[in-house]
A protein has these predicted regions:
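N-terminal secretory/targeting leader peptides
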Residues: 8-107, 121-344
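N-terminal signal peptide c-region/cleavage motif recognized by signal peptidases
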Residues: 2-4
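N-terminal FAD-binding dinucleotide-binding subdomain shared by FAD-dependent oxidases/monooxygenases
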Residues: 112
Length: 344
């Protein structure tokens, strides 16, 4: 619950929901921080009561819940609804292994927000479900956790790996593994029974779900830090009717707080990545190895460039796919070069 101490009675008391535990930083703690900042900036005129842990909305119904106004605000995962969020869903399911360098999580947050503003196709997907996207919430970068140690690309050959989504199976197939679709809640059992040998996910998710108990061997698919997805997998989203109840000054406060938090969000998730990797290293028999630059180049060379594929797929579906991907690449290059966004 976010409300400043000693504030006046709220003019707008909004209901929030979160499908995972509050302790989950990406979409729990960051949602609470956003709500706290909005409440403080409005001097208590806006307050939030956020119910965590799927007690109010679950993974399967949190889209209908926010769209239908059961709640006013939520951490929404477009990655779980690729049919309705085709544009956003494409970019959340790709990791750029073809460029020499990729943006960090702060860069992901800035790029996600900017493309939303520049291409109406993104906002239209939210408007179709009566939502407004306010703040991207990127995941910590994906790593590989296996039941036995992995030191190189060759060690992955023939292993079975959990997958999901449209583009991840392609990325994983060219690691030399056999991708198998396994729902997240079943990952532990799938590893324990040998249905899969490895998972490909964020270190925080791996640790939070205790997968390190059965898969303590971490392989970072990069020479140093793992690379993030092109887009955030989740966002702070508000029901449009709820947002429109606010007078203009309070609407602006919500928008300003969301804009100002982009740097904070990226930095908080970089810390989550580091902390989770440290936690995974404490597992019994744990190992951690890194993909060599040579293996990364080999992986990229034998994998179709999924940014190009996404551009073609989006164009075929009637979206400005070529323009979106070209602009993504332009912003990513400018961010990496330190030329964008302008330092304040």
């Amino acid at each position: 619950v976010a409300a400043p101490v000693g504030a006046q009675a709220a003019d707008f008391a909004f209901q929030g929901a979160h499908i995972f535990p509050e302790s989950f930083v990406q979409t729990g703690q960051n949602l609470e921080e956003w709500a706290k900042r909005v409440s403080e900036a409005s001097n208590g005129r806006i307050t939030f009561n956020i119910v965590h842990g799927g007690a109010l909305l679950s993974l399967g119904d949190h889209l209908d819940g926010i769209a239908g106004g059961l709640v006013d605000v939520t951490s929404f995962y477009p990655i779980y609804f690729p049919g309705e969020f085709q544009v956003e869903g494409a970019l959340t399911n790709i990791i750029d292994i073809w460029s020499e360098e990729a943006p960090d999580l702060e860069g992901v947050t800035h790029i996600h927000s900017t493309l939303h503003k520049e291409f109406p196709a993104f906002a239209a997907e939210y408007e179709n479900r009566n939502m407004q996207m306010l703040l991207p919430l990127p995941a910590d970068p994906y790593v590989i956790a296996c039941k036995t140690e992995v030191k190189s690309l060759a060690d992955l050959e023939g292993r079975k790996m959990r997958t999901f989504g449209r583009y991840f199976p392609i990325l994983q197939q060219h690691l030399g593994v056999e991708p198998l679709t396994v729902p997240g809640p079943e990952a532990y059992q799938a590893l324990a029974t040998g249905l899969v040998d490895c998972v490909y996910s964020t270190p925080d998710w791996i640790y939070s779900n205790s997968l390190h108990e059965v898969a303590p061997h971490v392989f970072i698919p990069a020479p140093e830090r793992a690379r993030p997805q092109l887009f955030a997998t989740a966002v702070v989203a508000m029901n449009v009717n709820s947002f429109n109840k606010l007078p203009d000054d309070l609407k602006q406060i919500v928008l300003d707080v969301s804009e100002d938090m982009k740097g904070y969000i990226g930095q908080s998730m970089e810390k989550v990545y580091d902390t989770a990797l440290d936690n995974l290293s404490k597992a019994n028999g744990a190992t951690r190895n890194y993909m060599s630059a040579e293996d990364l180049a080999t992986w990229a060379e034998r994998t179709p460039n999924l940014l190009d594929q996404a551009a073609a797929d989006l164009t075929a579906a009637g979206y400005p796919g070529d323009e979106i991907i070209a602009r993504y690449r332009e912003l990513a290059a400018a961010y990496i070069a330190g030329e964008w966004p302008a330092k304040q």
